[in-house]
């Protein structure tokens, strides 16, 4: 009996389960265990909807049913360590799991303390984010009560989950303020360390998005690396010494991997197989660091967690001698960008193309917003339904 351990039951981990089931490989002699802190996850693109007021926070979590996870061992707990030599995983209750193959899909977590003053500003209510369910609820309340002044959207550091999220958030905030008939009272801007939005998408989508921001009266300021926040003065201080004041700050939190191997930092993987430098260990999704053929980092986005799961699952089965077929990570990806008024644009293409990706944005439409809604509905039905995945 070969033991497969999957860390994380989010989009990546669940996709691994689905890929193994659909592989056609007999599962009788495979012992599959998935570990997760609470077996509740969400699609990241639903959080801006909560901030905008289109969804309630408690409607966002997706909890896989027992039927959907039938035949899979489930352990609720946190991972505190991985020993790649002994091939064991240590959990918060000090118990250990041994494995023949390990797939790490634990994602990224918010790390506000990495920027001095940020946590204090958030505690005071002057700074909010929408990178967690609770955070999105806080941002919703803050924007609902905001009617005049300087509203600053800030990308505190790179990398971060969902490349379009900061700009989508600014567009939806503008949409909300217009709906409240107070948009003319608000100075709305975005600051980011990026040269332009979506740099991993190539040279075209970013300028398109900047123009979309400008069309909505949102100022874009690239190449601004955050140094610290002054909570008393309500000021962002950048690395070059420049500053911007705010009445309300909506920020993308600093990110760090939820789980890593032997130290800290994102887990480097082979850009084709998703295998780490350790035999029998793969990493996928947000926790993995993938460099595309053009030298750009692969975005931390749900589609690439799914693509990585497909490649890793096939390679695990081959590694365990259950299949002759390996898998390679696909660079084909897409994302939707809500622009307001229940309309969305889409960026889609091959992030592995050379000499660089050539992603462009489509014109916003209501049909693309509905497509985005359908994507969540289909994923939710797959895992919450009685029929399972």
Annotated model-derived regions:
Residues 1-73, 157-203:
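Beta1-alpha1 glycine-rich phosphate/pyrophosphate-binding loop at the start
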Residues 12, 40, 107-110, 255-257:
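Short glycine-rich anion-binding loops that position phosphate/pyrophosphate groups of nucleotides
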Residues 29-33, 70-86, 97, 175-271, ...:
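A Rossmann-like FAD-binding core segment of flavoenzymes
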Residues 72-168, 175-181, 250:
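FAD-binding core/adjacent interface of flavoenzyme oxidoreductases
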Residues 93, 106-107, 240, 253-254, ...:
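Glycine-rich, N-terminal phosphate-binding loop of Rossmann-like dinucleotide-binding domains
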Residues 120-147, 243-307:
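FAD-site-proximal beta/loop scaffold in flavoenzymes
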Residues 175, 304-330:
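Internal hydrophobic alpha-helix adjacent to the cofactor/substrate pocket in enzyme cavities
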């Amino acid at each position: 009996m070969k033991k497969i351990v999957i860390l994380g039951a989010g989009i990546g981990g669940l996709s691994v389960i689905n890929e193994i089931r659909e592989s056609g490989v007999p599962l009788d002699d495979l012992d599959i265990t998935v570990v997760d802190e609470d077996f509740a996850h969400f699609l990241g693109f639903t959080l801006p909807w909560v901030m905008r007021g289109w969804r309630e926070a408690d409607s966002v979590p997706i909890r896989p049913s027992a039927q959907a996870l039938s035949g899979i061992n489930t352990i609720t707990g946190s991972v505190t360590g991985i020993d790649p030599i002994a091939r064991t995983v240590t959990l918060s209750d000090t118990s250990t799991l041994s494995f023949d193959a390990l797939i790490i899909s634990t994602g990224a977590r918010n790390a506000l303390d990495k920027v001095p003053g940020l946590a204090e500003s958030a505690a005071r209510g002057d700074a909010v984010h929408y990178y967690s369910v609770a955070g999105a609820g806080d941002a919703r309340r803050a924007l609902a009560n905001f009617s005049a002044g300087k509203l600053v959207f800030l990308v505190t550091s790179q990398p971060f989950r969902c490349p379009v999220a900061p700009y989508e958030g600014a567009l939806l905030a503008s949409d909300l303020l217009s709906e409240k008939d107070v948009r003319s009272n608000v100075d709305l801007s975005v600051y980011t360390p990026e040269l332009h939005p979506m740099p991993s998408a190539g040279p075209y989508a970013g300028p398109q998005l900047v123009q979309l921001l400008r069309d909505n009266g949102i100022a874009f300021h690239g190449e601004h690396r955050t140094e610290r926040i002054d909570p008393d003065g309500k000021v962002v201080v950048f690395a070059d010494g420049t500053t911007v004041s705010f009445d309300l700050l909506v920020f993308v939190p600093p990110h760090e991997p939820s789980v890593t191997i032997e130290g800290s930092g994102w887990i480097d993987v082979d850009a084709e197989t998703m295998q780490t430098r350790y035999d029998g260990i793969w990493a996928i999704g947000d926790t993995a660091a993938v460099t595309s053929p053009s030298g750009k980092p692969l975005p931390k986005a749900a589609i690439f967690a799914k693509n990585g799961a497909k490649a890793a699952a096939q390679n695990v089965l081959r590694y365990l001698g259950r299949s002759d077929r390996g898998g390679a990570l696909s660079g084909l990806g897409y994302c939707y960008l809500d622009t307001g008024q229940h309309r969305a644009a889409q960026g889609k293409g091959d992030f592995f193309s050379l000499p660089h990706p050539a992603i462009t944005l489509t014109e916003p439409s209501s049909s693309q917003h509905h497509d985005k809604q359908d994507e969540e509905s289909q994923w939710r039905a797959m895992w919450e339904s009685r029929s399972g995945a």
